[in-house]
Amino acid sequence: MIIRPSEPEVKIAVDRDPVKTSFEEWARPGHFSRTIAKGPDTTTWIWNLHADAHDFDSHTGDLEEISRKVFSAHFGQLSIIFLWLSGMYFHGARFSNYEAWLSDPTHIGPSAQVVWPIVGQEILNGDVGGGFRGIQITSGFFQIWRASGITSELQLYCTAIGALIFASLMLFAGWFHYHKAAPKLAWFQDVESMLNHHLAGLLGLGSLSWAGHQIHVSLPINQFLDAGVDPKEIPLPHEFILNRDLLAQLYPSFAEGATPFFTLNWSKYAEFLSFRGGLDPITGGLWLSDIAHHHLAIAILFLIAGHMYRTNWGIGHGLKDILEAHKGPFTGQGHKGLYEILTTSWHAQLSLNLAMLGSTTIVVAHHMYSMPPYPYLATDYGTQLSLFTHHMWIGGFLIVGAAAHAAIFMVRDYDPTTRYNDLLDRVLRHRDAIISHLNWVCIFLGFHSFGLYIHNDTMSALGRPQDMFSDTAIQLQPIFAQWIQNIHAGAPGVTAPGATTSTSLTWGGGELVAVGGKVALLPIPLGTADFLVHHIHAFTIHVTVLILLKGVLFARSSRLIPDKANLGFRFPCDGPGRGGTCQVSAWDHVFLGLFWMYNSISVVIFHFSWKMQSDVWGTISDQGIVTHITGGNFAQSSITINGWLRDFLWAQASQVIQSYGSSLSAYGLFFLGAHFVWAFSLMFLFSGRGYWQELIESIVWAHNKLKVAPATQPRALSIIQGRAVGVTHYLLGGIATTWAFFLARIIAVG
């Protein structure tokens, strides 16, 4: 750490009134580009307009102007998020059975949408219990509202109005910080200040205020709810905040105020800042007092972290110094130059952030079921399945986005003349070794993982079960995974002496938790079936990485096309006369990577859905006998490809296929429609541009004959446009098909 004398001069961080506010440009589509602004000659114009509208790099080369546009757009994005949240809360306030659900969450399903009977579609309003008819929702909003201490639909209504006010504030901020007081480039590049404010402000004070809300509002209200008090009789949130005696009745140590804090007698607060571990047996969720404790601890860590970086007072860490000192014995210049890259290329910055956020989102997906954070979430199987699936898809898309922006950085922002022997340069210089090894790994994993299934299918077909890989014949137990499970299950009292239970019941060792006769969570057994499918996961993930990483490492040049950087991020081929150079652009790698990301995530969510129905979710009788939804058939059925097709896809599709005439029939229609959207994509992916151009010419001829030809000349989609439309419909169709299949199934049986 270097300590320099503080600099007294005042820095001016904004420009006043840099851009006049005017609506004239709104009337000129494509005002950001000279070519597009001329208006359409051919139908390609509308595609270029959409492709380039948000590509700020192509509007100007001025980094300050680009930064301001991105910054302003972020406020617009936040405004949309607040608007969306407001809509969710408004539905809860106006169209939901939230108050009824609150009084009996085990027998009443959450619903916040009632279909109007216009053409007879009121059939979709199923009976969710308690005499309420509506569409069952699986977003988890009811559970999070209960955890926050919301007890009435009026409170939801007020929150919805509050979110609308914030949405308009964000819109105003977006306009203000572009037209009235726009930050200078130096402000965007002041990473130490940004770190301090984001760490201490957003994460530190954000967590602290949430911890405060949980202690003063959520905990007491949930205490009353758990005890069966009618929500209408529970004091309102502000009463707990203003009247300490109310809290002291529930938590006696509240009467002592801040004295235990200053006398370091902190254990007095253990009533509401607990360290219990495990799940609350009443709600099947994590203990809310544990969650409050967690947020308080996190807040303190981030508040400290937000004071570590050097800004005005010449004390603290400088990011540039940290990065440049980061050298290993075998890494040449190490991270030298990374600081310059990350403060001048927003694509490089975004790429890192997307990779981190995508990975975090996938980690969240796995924690939502193994450590269910909200009351009555674990027994709402539809919501559990939806939350896992949703976070897996989002994580997958974010990680592909990370590769996309890394490649854009390589093409547009990377300057090879200034980079020598730093980590990035060294990776680029041995990219052939990286990609060829990765390729070998993919071939190995593909043949071996798939080979195990093919072996099992063959033995099963020949009637030789004793020669199959299974828990009852040739065992391939996942011993490393079981070892990790055992370490965690045995941690309390050994490696974590302060803990009373392990972090998650899924590790094993504990008793199952059931709420209202339904299983919330139990130790998850792993066997040969999991070993097989985990190697399919390894295979699909490595292929996705191979495609995406090859796109990044060969974005600027390759043996095939040494001057690739000059062709840009997306191009169809290296010009006429160079055969075999199509589909090599960085964009095409993102395109291909999306398909393999879709493969990867599909296998994960199928594995999760079947495993949970087979080994976790189910009912428990008065005698303590657990009956799982599919009766534990995962271990013996999922070890063949035929088993996946027969006992998972086909057997569990019966609910969506037979949904017509019931309240689930919308899922049946979606299942059909989404298959159609998916099939529609193949038309774009399997045919060439010339085919369509020929067809268009004869259609134009017919229009000319009838004198109804348009002034704008119709053109076939370019190769890139066709692939973009194709992959979009492929993913949209595939994801919506899966959604309909999952939800119809789990709402019917869960």
Curated annotation (Swiss-Prot):
> TM spans, by residue?
70-93, 156-179, 195-219, 291-309, 346-369, 385-411, 433-455, 531-549, 589-610, 664-686, 724-744
Swiss-Prot/TrEMBL keywords? 4Fe-4S, Chlorophyll, Chloroplast, Chromophore, Electron transport, Iron, Iron-sulfur, Magnesium, Membrane, Metal-binding, Oxidoreductase, Photosynthesis, Photosystem I, Plastid, Thylakoid, Transmembrane, Transmembrane helix, Transport
- EC number(s)? 1.97.1.12
Q: Where does [4Fe-4S] cluster bind?
A: 573, 582
Extract one GO BP annotation from the record: photosynthesis
Matching Gene3D superfamilies, A to Z? Photosystem I PsaA/PsaB
The record's subcellular location field reads: Plastid, Chloroplast thylakoid membrane
Which residues are noted in the entry as chlorophyll a-binding? 683, 691
Q: Which GO terms describe its molecular function?
A: 4 iron, 4 sulfur cluster binding; chlorophyll binding; electron transfer activity; magnesium ion binding; oxidoreductase activity
GO CC: one term? photosystem I
> What does the cofactor field's note say?
P700 is a chlorophyll a/chlorophyll a' dimer, A0 is one or more chlorophyll a, A1 is one or both phylloquinones and FX is a shared 4Fe-4S iron-sulfur center.
Q: How does the record classify its membrane topology?
A: Multi-pass membrane protein
Q: Which residues bind chlorophyll a'?
A: 675
One Pfam family matching this protein? PsaA_PsaB
The record describes the protein's role as: PsaA and PsaB bind P700, the primary electron donor of photosystem I (PSI), as well as the electron acceptors A0, A1 and FX. PSI is a plastocyanin-ferredoxin oxidoreductase, converting photonic excitation into a charge separation, which transfers an electron from the donor P700 chlorophyll pair to the spectroscopically characterized acceptors A0, A1, FX, FA and FB in turn. Oxidized P700 is reduced on the lumenal side of the thylakoid membrane by plastocyanin.
UniProt similarity note: Belongs to the PsaA/PsaB family.
Q: What HAMAP family has UniProt attached to this entry?
A: PSI_PsaA
Name the NCBIfam families on file.
psaA (TIGR01335)
Subunit comment = The PsaA/B heterodimer binds the P700 chlorophyll special pair and subsequent electron acceptors. PSI consists of a core antenna complex that captures photons, and an electron transfer chain that converts photonic excitation into a charge separation. The eukaryotic PSI reaction center is composed of at least 11 subunits.
* Name of the molecule in the record: Photosystem I P700 chlorophyll a apoprotein A1
Q: Which organism is it from?
A: Sorghum bicolor (Sorghum)
Q: Its encoding gene is what?
A: psaA
